[in-house]
Amino acid sequence: MTFRTTAVTAFAAAALLTPVLLGPAAANATPSTGVSAVTLAHTDIPAGLLPFIPQGAHVEVREITIAPGGTTGWHYHDAQIYGLVRQGTLTHPGADCKPVVYRAGQIIEEPGGKANTHEGTNLGTVPVILDVLYVMPPGKPLSEDADAPACAQP
């Protein structure tokens, strides 16, 4: 199975679980502003249960809302994640500070690792709403705070 097939399968399995409300993640290096998140579903896949995830995984689906003028702050993920922009326009610069713009209906694929530090910003007038699928290594957080890259320093 491909990772994409695995992710879709995990998304479907996680979507069947009971919703749990979580608050916004705290950021230390470059704090988020105007961001809230609701966990729609989550589960843990034990090591050895699925051959395509031999180490196991924490699977979580979250609805993330970024208010107009809000930002996630600079961060990265320890594994590739997938998102769907349900509403609004997300400006998404990476470590090279070149913004990529995602509009409603578009899919975001974010590679994992510190080298893929990025931020999400809402420069529009309506909230950005994202549905994000995380398939994370056991014990890893959904995101890791990061310093803004040199190109983003004022």
Q: Model segments located where?
A:
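Glycine- and acidic-residue-biased ligand/ion/polar-headgroup-sensing regions
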Residues: 77-97, 106-107
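Ligand-binding loop in jelly-roll beta-barrel domains
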Residues: 98, 113-140
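A short beta-loop-beta micro-motif enriched in histidine and acidic residues
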Residues: 54-57, 70-84
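Extended, low-polarity transmembrane helix blocks
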Residues: 29, 126-130, 136-137, 141-154
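Short acidic-glycine-tyrosine-enriched beta hairpin
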Residues: 66-67, 94-115
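Extracytoplasmic
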Residues: 56-61, 125-128
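Short histidine-centered beta-strand/loop micro-motifs
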Residues: 72-77, 94, 101, 119-122
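A short, N-terminal "cap"/entry segment at the start of jelly-roll beta-barrel domains
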Residues: 2-11, 15-58, 146-154
